[in-house]
């Protein structure tokens, strides 16, 4: 069985060497979809009986690990010295230094890397993170797959 939940956040970024407007500082209303697979929990006394995982727990983990960290932040590539220097001069600015250029593809892969260890097989139901889908716009997204 697979389950999917969706969370949204706002963040800024830039693609430093991009040939078009994406090289400029700009932002998006991102959506993050998390797909997990596992057996339906059969333990009758468990609050999660009949579920793969409680959606509220799926969302809480994603919020704490990724969404709250990235929401209303500027995601900047660690080697984008010009923008990093600028952001470091802004008092109390929420900056996330990214290991790679923060494209939709790299953001999806980074979210997958972060979340993979967060979703534990607590009930022995073979819980597994299958996919992280990151929407940069309503019509454009990237999938990071198991």
Segments (PLM) and residue ranges:
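Charge-rich, low-complexity N-terminal segments
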Residues: 1-146
